[in-house]
């Protein structure tokens, strides 16, 4: 079976074609600036990368172009569109309606649209991809939608409810949903596989740390709590997002600064977090680390705050699960920032978390075990693969 994995933005389309017999990536690429000037496609087969300018008035033309790149010329990996057995789409928000991946129908599209107020930037983009895919591939080709929120749907009410008037949950769906679930699921399963144990026998804390960051408590294969909330703004401080703050700060700033709700939303989402504290506009952890090394005290403070917050979540989730067997670091920062991993794990001996400093500094491969001597908790650095997880889910849904 060959599965095409799609991740749509409002003006972009990221894709990957996988042969599920071997789980090998046949090709991958990115269509950019859809609906605007200078639209183009970058198509990669192995180490060979091709770029072509092409007009993409909509996602439909982008789909048609990626099919052309796959079936013709230098980037050809299949003979025809018929070799693609199914298309798997990433969707950020499934709300309470979608607790697992499902086949796309008119009713599913309608429901995803109804959930758009919960993810106004992401769900409409997913819908553009779903509709364009059906246009290009035809209505008979199976399309499967995989939700970022689905893996977190096992959280109990005591973890997902907010202490607000209950009718706000009933009428408006105000509750914790959690995000980046596809990554959390992939690395938790990978960790269990590495440890040679069934997921149902383990208590795992997964730390997906990147420009967007999320931590999850996975007990016996099910999420019991996670750091992100009703939106991906909650939880840890991130590259440019504030994470958890006192809710009263929002109104205080709105009136003190004399700004609109939209302007405040921009500050909380795009000018806060590591960027806001450090003064490094990019919010990129590498830039902040460099600034801290050069003696920038605000950059150092931003790093200290992030490390401290991650520690707190690890401690609280260990308590929530009654212990921890495995701690996983993943995501752009989690996989590549040895300094952060060491700082986070320092002082967690009482939980049985100890790392080998040399292994931590020389971390390579899909799974890197950095557990230290006499460490009771397996500490792993795992390269996440959300596309592969979406492809697996798609294959499973189609075969069912």
Model-based region annotation:
Residues 3, 12-57, 229:
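Short glycine-rich, Thr/Ser-proximal phosphate-binding strand/loop in the N-terminal lobe
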Residues 70, 76-122, 142-144, 150-159:
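Short beta-strand-loop/turn "lid" adjacent to the catalytic site in phosphate-handling enzymes
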Residues 89, 121-124, 142-147, 205-207, ...:
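General beta-strand structural signal in soluble alpha/beta enzymes
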Residues 151-255:
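Glycine-rich phosphate-binding loop of actin/hexokinase-like ATP-binding domains
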Residues 187-190, 194, 301-322:
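Phosphate/ATP-binding catalytic cores across multiple sugar-kinase/actin-like superfamilies
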Residues 257-302:
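A mobile "lid/hinge" subdomain adjacent to the ATP/sugar-phosphate binding pocket shared
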Residues 325-347:
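Glycine-rich phosphate-binding loops at beta-strand->alpha-helix junctions
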Residues 366-400:
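Structural signal for terminal/edge beta-strands and the immediately following C-terminal loop/tail
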């Amino acid at each position: 079976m060959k599965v095409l994995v799609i991740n749509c933005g409002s003006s972009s389309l990221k894709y990957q074609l996988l042969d599920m017999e071997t789980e090998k990536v046949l090709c991958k690429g990115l269509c950019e600036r859809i609906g605007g000037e200078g639209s183009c496609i970058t198509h990669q087969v192995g180490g060979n990368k091709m770029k072509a300018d092409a007009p993409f008035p909509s996602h439909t033309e982008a789909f048609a172009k990626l099919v052309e790149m796959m079936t013709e010329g230098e980037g050809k990996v299949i003979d025809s569109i018929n070799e693609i057995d199914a298309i798997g789409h990433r969707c950020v928000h499934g709300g309470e309606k979608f607790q697992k991946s499902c086949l796309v129908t008119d009713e599913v599209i309608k429901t995803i649209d109804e959930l758009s107020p919960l993810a106004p930037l992401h769900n409409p983009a997913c819908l553009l991809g779903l509709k364009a895919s059906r246009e290009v591939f035809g209505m008979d080709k199976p399309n499967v939608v995989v939700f970022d929120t689905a893996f977190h749907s096992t959280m109990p009410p005591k973890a997902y409810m907010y202490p607000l008037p209950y009718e706000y949950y009933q009428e408006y769906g105000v509750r914790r949903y959690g995000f980046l679930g596809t990554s959390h699921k992939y690395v938790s399963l990978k960790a269990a596989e590495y440890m040679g144990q069934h997921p149902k026998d383990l208590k795992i804390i997964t730390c997906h740390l990147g420009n967007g960051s999320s931590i999850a408590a996975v007990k016996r294969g099910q999420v019991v709590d996670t750091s992100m909330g009703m939106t991906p703004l909650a939880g840890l401080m991130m590259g440019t997002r504030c994470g958890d703050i006192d809710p009263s700060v929002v109104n205080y700033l709105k009136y003190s600064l004399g700004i609109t709700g939209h302007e405040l939303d921009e500050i909380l989402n795009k000018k806060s977090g590591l960027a806001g504290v450090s003064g490094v506009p990019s919010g990129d952890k590498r830039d902040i680390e460099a600034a801290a090394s050069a003696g920038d005290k605000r950059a150092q403070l931003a790093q200290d705050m992030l490390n401290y917050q991650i520690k707190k979540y690890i401690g609280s989730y260990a308590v929530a699960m009654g212990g921890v067997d495995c701690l996983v670091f993943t995501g752009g920062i989690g996989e590549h920032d040895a300094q952060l991993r060491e700082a986070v794990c320092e002082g967690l001996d009482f939980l049985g978390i100890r790392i080998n400093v040399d292994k931590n500094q020389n971390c390579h491969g899909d799974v890197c075990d950095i557990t230290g001597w006499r460490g009771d908790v397996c500490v792993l650095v795992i390269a996440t693969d959300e596309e592969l997880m979406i492809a697996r889910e798609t294959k499973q849904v189609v075969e069912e």
